[in-house]
């Protein structure tokens, strides 16, 4: 939904914007082009490997990358008297939940637009060494930042059965969470679950035979639940929505693309409260969804929902 996102963000020429989930810079490339040669783009990602790939992609834009950004004005724009050698794109590792600190470190007071494309990128899914996907056999990791936190293997091999059930039920919305948690505990008593295939096979054995005939792989919800827990995705999102909204200048917009009901519900409720209690105007009364054509080109987009809010004061 890149076209719709750019239209709703309404980035001004020469403005300043943030891609809070940089990934492979698909959205960032379009944002940089919309901002023009005098604009500034800040790209953030928790995954350092994504930053390297994004830098390669953004090299096609006629904008310098990775020099320190200059101080911002009180209105959130950049100093109009910039040195012509200064960067227009700044990429850094971090989380959008800490955007206030990131902007402060760059001496940027506020921005014109922020995009959050939640979930996991194809780049991460397709790397078997990262352990996000069950279609490959790889280490059961799932960390967006491999240098921090516990892995999915740590969770499935150490948590109590009741804790695993809670995670799989709440974050995966998996109705057979109890059976799956019991199967995990039984399997790890025989041998530690260390690979994606071991976990997927364990889940399959726990499920009724008829349950394996659905549209999605039977292990999808369990993998989603563990990934959300490993990366604290909902906590990061809840904190990040507040931080991002407060980082907008007057008239600035925050666009969020979510991929499952837990994320979308959180975004919907937060935007609603920002509209009532803060200076927010929700621009999408109903979430925008991908067109049939886009779903055909990118099957992952079939579950995407986009919501946008504007800071009006």
Please state what every model-predicted region is.
Residues 1-67, 79-313:
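S-adenosyl-L-methionine-dependent methyltransferase catalytic core, i.e., the SAM/SAH-binding region
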């Amino acid at each position: 939904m890149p076209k719709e996102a750019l239209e709703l963000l309404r980035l001004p020429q020469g403005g300043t914007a943030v891609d809070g989930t940089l990934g492979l810079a698909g959205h960032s490339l379009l944002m940089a082009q919309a901002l023009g040669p005098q604009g500034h783009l800040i790209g953030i990602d928790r995954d350092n490997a994504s930053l390297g790939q994004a830098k390669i992609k953004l090299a096609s834009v006629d904008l310098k990358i990775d020099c320190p950004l200059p101080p911002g004005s009180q209105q959130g724009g950049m100093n109009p008297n910039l040195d012509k050698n200064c960067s227009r794109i700044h990429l850094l590792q971090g989380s959008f939940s800490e955007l206030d600190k990131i902007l402060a470190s760059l001496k940027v007071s506020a921005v014109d637009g922020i995009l959050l494309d939640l979930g996991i990128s194809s780049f991460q899914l397709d790397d078997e060494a990262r352990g996000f996907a069950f279609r490959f056999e790889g280490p059961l990791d799932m960390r967006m930042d491999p240098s921090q936190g516990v892995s999915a293997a740590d969770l499935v091999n150490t948590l109590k059965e009741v804790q695993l059930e809670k995670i799989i039920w709440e974050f995966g919305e998996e109705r057979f969470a109890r059976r799956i948690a019991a199967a995990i505990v039984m399997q790890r008593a025989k041998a530690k679950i260390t690979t994606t295939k071991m976990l997927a096979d364990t889940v399959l054995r726990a499920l009724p035979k008829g349950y394996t005939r659905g549209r999605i792989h039977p292990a999808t919800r369990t993998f989603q639940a563990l990934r959300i827990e490993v990366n604290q995705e909902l906590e990061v999102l809840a904190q990040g929505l507040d931080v991002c909204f407060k980082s907008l200048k007057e008239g600035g917009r925050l666009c969020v693309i979510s991929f499952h009901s837990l994320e979308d519900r959180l975004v919907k409720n937060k935007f609603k409260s920002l509209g009532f209690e803060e200076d927010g105007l929700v621009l999408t009364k109903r979430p925008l969804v991908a067109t049939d054509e886009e779903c055909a080109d990118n099957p992952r987009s079939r579950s995407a929902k986009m919501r946008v809010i504007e800071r009006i004061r």
